[in-house]
Amino acid sequence: FDVDAHAVVIKEGDTISTGKHTLAFAMIPMVHWPEAMVTYDAYDKVLFSADAFGTFGALNGNVFADEVNFKEEWLDDARRYLVNIVGKYGGPVQSALKKALTLDIAMICPLHGPIWREDLGWFIDKYQKWSTYTPEDHNVVVMYASIYGNTENAADVLAGRLADAGEKNVKVYDVSVTDPSYLVAEAFRCDRIVFACPTYNAGLFPKMETLLHELAAHNLQKRKVAVLENGTWAPTAGKQMKEILSGMKDMEIYEETVTVKSALKEDQLAQLDKIVEFMTK
């Protein structure tokens, strides 16, 4: 395409003076495009951060993060954005953060989402955790797939027993009705995950298989996990879930597989309690 004759081509380390403002440029490849670049205004100490520090969601009049309830209304979407778009590229995000931390920044202006002018360190710390695959919260999340409701029941019973053991804020998700982007974000947030899945055509229920491959593709690591399978004749879901999980880095996987044959039986509650013990020790 035609390029305007007055266009100035810039590269890493270049600066442009517009009077009192001096703009410096730095490449942040794969955050989230290969050619991504940020701009720093040394006079106002503003970092124009491109997609970094952005979120899903549209502004509703207020443009600054300190003008909204960011923790309650925006943080989940900020996490979901970062981990789903560049979760795989923790290294490049770390490189971008190292460049940013050498600057005296008073304001961060992302391409989308609120502008940051207060508590910058708090949000930068979130990026530090997300890009190093460090869990934010000491919570258990149970993710299940269920065909007839029996695996769902087992997941709910397990969640109740986790609560009885003192676990706070246990979350339970049906992978068939929850968009994978939310589940990936929850897996990045929590430090412990239980996957419950029925055997389907000698394999995994498709929604659970998709989720596990999404987690692997986004480089999830450093989690404590357990699996629960359901299968009446030849249950194989547990083995296949573990095969995918074992390919992820630094995962602590519960050795035993709890097998439900059609419906959870009372004499299997002790097996659920062993998962609870593993998750809470």
Go through each PLM region and give its residues:
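Short, charged N-terminal beta->alpha structural module
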Residues: 143-165
